[in-house]
Amino acid sequence: MKNIFTFLLLVFIGGQFLWGQPANLVWNTQSRNASESMPCGGGDIGMNVWVENDDVLFYLSRSGSFDENNCLLKQGRFRVRLTPNPFAGTASFRQTLHLNDGYVSVSSDNATLIIWVDVFHPVVHVEVKTKELTSMRVNFESWRYEDRPVRKGEGQQCSYKWAIPDGLMTRRDSVCVEEDNFTFFHRNPERTIFDVVVDQQGMNEVKEQLYNPLKNLIFGGRLSGDNLVYNGTRRGHYAGTEYLAWMYKSKKPTYKQSARIVLNTEQSTVPAWEASLARTEKEINVSKDKQATRRWWNDFWKRSFIEGEGEAGDAIRNYTLFRYMLGCNAYSQWPTKFNGGLFTFDPMYVDQKMEFTPDFRKWGGGTMTAQNQRLVYWPMLKSGDFDLMKSQFDFYLRLLPTAEARTRAYWGHAGACFTEQMENFGLPNPAEYGFKRPASFDKGLEYNAWLEYEWDTVLEFCQMILETARYDSLDISCYTPLIESSLSFFDEHYRQLALQRGRKDLDGSGKLVIYPGSACETYKMAYNPS
């Protein structure tokens, strides 16, 4: 009997192990353009990887790369070319997303190129092995080599949306060319859209109390490789956008070579930013880091999985790929944006009229639309991805002082007011708040038919926090002030409104009346919406 039990247990464990490994995604042909790209990432980094005209390309994005207009900028585009090219004219071409280990490979009979991201350090690795002596060229391609005017329709990528001020620019990046490495970064000035919004919404008296993630923010990185040397620049054009490429090539042909991109994001001076970047470079241990990263992805897939065949199998495959992309932002300071996350691409491949840069996305970069964000995060309870939820919860916790300051400034009572279409610094999106408002209109309200009185979405995230404790017995005590203050706002505010209309602040049953309210963006002047 004991032997039978042991056998059944081994079968069960073995089945669990096999079922928990997602199948690789394999392509046998090259891509036509960036819209046919494959996700790759880890930690808080995401890449769109594709092979076009025998070149391996990838867009590199990192969470939190917000510019002065609150656009979520990409780091840039990288292009890798091998000579002789093992991917040209071969029937053995294969591009694979190795889901269980979290990396992408491009291979043929004569070569393998691997791209992976260190989950625990902001480092991208490119590794090449070939059967014959091969030279490698790595280009950094940037469309932000000069100041770029934000054109009509392009404002959707930033917090101005349709209300772009005259002369609005996306400022150029800074670069530093060395013989064996290339440094690139974007640095926000002291004055950003944060200051514009604070002034617009009458919050200057409490400005110093407000969270400001944009002032002097620097983000970027450094490209280097043991066998790479600078090889000049060239101009080009991709998907309707001009770019400038800085090129590095192999010092000599070899069978094995590599490149790495180390990233850094912080609010500081350029020298301090460079020092942090250098520390990350010194800490790299490729073998150890790769092992730790693959172990993390292996464990990620063991948490939960869904099985199915036929049409269900197709849906499950899409769910698995979506979960992989969420996993690429597991340890970010910022939640995964509902409108593309880290994996947007050139908009002209969606609509040919939108010949905007690869930085473009609708519904903003630093604008958080809570009623959409919740749809990204609710499923994580069922998949067991509680650690991925932390960035969304911490987003609200960081903004708690701003939300409370806002309530005191406008209405003089306690509680945290979190609006819909809220910026990453805690105030309503300026376009949605309205630049043209009646002088007598309540300054605490968005002058907007869709968003006025829609401030209950935070309660769903409070409920998510409570559910994580129920699902996984997590300690959520650090979020207690957020939950209590969010609830206090409704009690304080709607009692205040009731007393402005009559002598009683509660109804005949002694219950709070929430009026006027809003059920999502659609049902306005709602009575006790739920």
Protein language model annotation of sequence segments:
Residues I4-G15:
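Sec-dependent N-terminal signal peptides
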Residues Q16-G20:
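Sec/Tat signal peptide C-region and signal peptidase I cleavage site
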Residues Q21-F435, E467, Y471-I476, A526-S530:
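Aromatic-residue-lined binding/catalytic grooves and analogous aromatic/hydrophobic interfacial grooves
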Residues A312, G366, Y447-W455, T480:
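Amphipathic, non-membrane alpha-helical segments in soluble helical-bundle scaffolds
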Residues A416-E423, A431-L466:
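C-terminal accessory segments of proteins
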Residues E454-T468, Y479-H493:
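Extended, hydrophobic alpha-helical segments in both membrane/secreted and soluble proteins
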Residues F489-S530:
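Acidic/histidine-rich catalytic neighborhood
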